[in-house]
Amino acid sequence: MKIKTRFAPSPTGYLHVGGARTALYSWLFARNHGGEFVLRIEDTDLERSTPEAIEAIMDGMNWLSLEWDEGPYYQTKRFDRYNAVIDQMLEEGTAYKCYCSKERLEALREEQMAKGEKPRYDGRCRHSHEHHADDEPCVVRFANPQEGSVVFDDQIRGPIEFSNQELDDLIIRRTDGSPTYNFCVVVDDWDMEITHVIRGEDHINNTPRQINILKALKAPVPVYAHVSMINGDDGKKLSKRHGAVSVMQYRDDGYLPEALLNYLVRLGWSHGDQEIFTREEMIKYFTLNAVSKSASAFNTDKLLWLNHHYINALPPEYVATHLQWHIEQENIDTRNGPQLADLVKLLGERCKTLKEMAQSCRYFYEDFAEFDADARKKHLRPVARQPLEVVRDKLAAITDWPAENVHHAIQATADELEVGMGKVGMPLRVAVTGAGQSPALDVTVHAIGRTRSIERINKALAFIAERENQQ
């Protein structure tokens, strides 16, 4: 049997982390078994579904490289198929037309609730033989079995059973002729030959209804697995107040897709005590029986730690391709300065996100208007004039410009003046970067370049001279 899974989001918003994890688990299960992964857009909610949301879902899937083998299929383009199946069910007697008014159904609901009963349709039209005009408004309901129970072996939670007496005669076609969500899902899974349905636990109550419809259609019933929800680190359901919840927001905030995927796969699944997984390892090791039944807590600090790991572990050239987008957001012209791959090597240890890296690198490419106020007050004082003049001259004398020679020039200045490296290094750092913090000074000066470094040292000396004149 060929394994076939699907990810079926509703395009009413962005791709959130819960949906992304579900997509990842479905994708991994298919890849682990050499199967196929289908993308289906469940856009039957015409009022809330938007083209922008569809694009956002696609963007998120593509950014995470969760490529699909079939699709995307759109439910709104399959209405003829759904209605043909409903008409067939009406002929076979597994569905019936219901003419009950909204007022009657509301009164029935209130009566049942007053008695402490679970609100459900009473089956009046199921057993009615009244004649109705062809154009009289009606819905179509599924004739759910009235006896027995539905049992399915959830691959994460174990056997789950529902009594058919608890289940309603589900509406499968509305008065406007449009099919309903639960019915469309069933026909899609049948037509697309889905073997395994991996989805959120909020769909557990839909499962017995869908199984009964599949059986009425004499269609194969897929295997089901329901993934637990994701909570914030405070134990409450994940929401915007816990931080970013959109996949593309994490891209915007400077996370690598590898970091988010690694974090999401471990958010409810484990393989021993291993924390870091390549995509190939995820595919190799992923099984549904290793997915936890318990809710997972989203920990942004852990994600940040993983992101920092991947910034330094992945090839700098690859990280640079993702950094480029953030550089563009900051409007930094990188034509005159180090290659982005070299920048990744320079700033990787200091920066935990690519956004932070982009915001920290401007001085490598563009001159700054002024020195940081605290840094200049502390380090660009008259006592720094001589160290800056000496180190400037030594840097200017270097014929070959590797970082090692820059280091020798700084060390030689400290030795000549008989001062500690900090007495030379800190004024030099502020002079060439405009700030009090940077990567190692020798590689920083090397990356900025000889000409630009000397120009900035002269600018710092002019600032010190002006400061002396004001005293």
Curated annotation (Swiss-Prot):
One of its GO terms (cellular component) is cytosol. CDD domains: GluRS_core (cd00808). Gene3D superfamilies: 1.10.10.350, HUPs. Binds 1 zinc ion per subunit. This is Glutamate--tRNA ligase. GO terms for biological process: glutamyl-tRNA aminoacylation. It comes from Shigella boydii serotype 4 (strain Sb227). Pfam families: Anticodon_2 (PF19269), tRNA-synt_1c (PF00749). Its main location: cytoplasm. Catalyzes the attachment of glutamate to tRNA(Glu) in a two-step reaction: glutamate is first activated by ATP to form Glu-AMP and then transferred to the acceptor end of tRNA(Glu). It is an enzyme of class 6 (ligase). One of its GO terms (molecular function) is zinc ion binding. Keywords: Aminoacyl-tRNA synthetase, ATP-binding, Cytoplasm, Ligase, Metal-binding, Nucleotide-binding, Protein biosynthesis, Zinc.
